[in-house]
Structures are given as structure tokens and as C-alpha cells.
Amino acid sequence: MPKGSGKVIAQNKKAFHDYFIEETYEAGLVLQGTEIKSIRAGRVNLKDAFARVHNGEVWVHNMHISTYEQGNRFNHDPLRTRKLLLHKKEIEKLAGASKETGYALVPVRIYLKNGFAKMALGLAKGKKQYDKRHDLKEKEAKREIARAFRDRQKM
């Protein structure tokens, strides 16, 4: 996350399990009034979200922002497609990279920065099943080492 960033609202842990995140970009979100209120309340889910470049614009799909509790009949659609704000050169770079086989644009986290909702968008390459198993083995080994050090400290 860039320096000076604010409060993290939601993280996409599944993205780190399913993909190698090679680069991340900070993108602004085009939101409606009730959507930002729901985000500030922490009612957002990035689990199945993905982004696509279409006509020189980046759009995020399947990002679920729950309806605002105190909203009236003008409440938003929870799964609507939302536009992301990026610089033109970043969009061109993402468009070229996402056309390559095996690459995807995945939302990594949503956070508030200076009162505005921002999204960390990752350029990701899919993991194979054996990569996932290897990561789990490494994680378990680190846990075992930490546990051994803790037990040794107690003695």
C-alpha cells in the first residue's frame, strides 16, 4: 500500500491464495452516496471481484457493497459494475498486460485515504495447484519454527 494510506476496509485474501500479485496500482472508485456510507461501515466484499479494461476504462465486476441500512428507495444495487479511476498510461499498461495469457486484474484491498475510497488493484498471474500446496507447506513450516522458538523461550 502506498505511503500515507489510511484505514483498510476490506482485503481480498483469496487473491493472494489463487494468484501471484506482480504489481499493484492505486485506483479511485466512482461511487454513489449510499455506497460510500456502506464502505465506511465496512460492508464490502471483494471475494469474487475482478476488473476488466473496456473502451479505455477500467471497470470492477462482482464487488459486493451491501445496501445502506438507513438508505431509502434510492439505495444502490449491491453488485453493480463500478468504474475505477486511473491515469491513462496505467490503463494502457494494464490493458496490454491483461491481454497476455494467464494474467488478470484482481482487487486486493479497499481503503480510505484522505476521506476518499481507494482500491489497490493487482496485476496477477494464476497459481497452479502445486504452487498453492507449496505455499501452504511454507506457511506451516514457519508456524512450526515460531512455535519451537516460543516453547524454547518459556524454558
From Swiss-Prot:
Domain of life: Bacteria
Organism: Bacillus anthracis
Major site of localization recorded for this protein: cytoplasm
Subcellular location: Cytoplasm
Protein's job: Required for rescue of stalled ribosomes mediated by trans-translation. Binds to transfer-messenger RNA (tmRNA), required for stable association of tmRNA with ribosomes. tmRNA and SmpB together mimic tRNA shape, replacing the anticodon stem-loop with SmpB. tmRNA is encoded by the ssrA gene; the 2 termini fold to resemble tRNA(Ala) and it encodes a 'tag peptide', a short internal open reading frame. During trans-translation Ala-aminoacylated tmRNA acts like a tRNA, entering the A-site of stalled ribosomes, displacing the stalled mRNA.
GO molecular function terms noted in the UniProt entry: RNA binding
InterPro entries: SmpB, SsrA-bd_prot, SsrA-bd_prot_CS
PANTHER family the UniProt entry points to: SSRA-BINDING PROTEIN (PTHR30308:SF2), TMRNA-BINDING COMPONENT OF TRANS-TRANSLATION TAGGING COMPLEX (PTHR30308)
UniProt-listed GO biological process terms: trans-translation
GO cellular component: cytosol
Keyword terms, alphabetized: Cytoplasm, RNA-binding
Family: Belongs to the SmpB family.
Record-given protein name: SsrA-binding protein
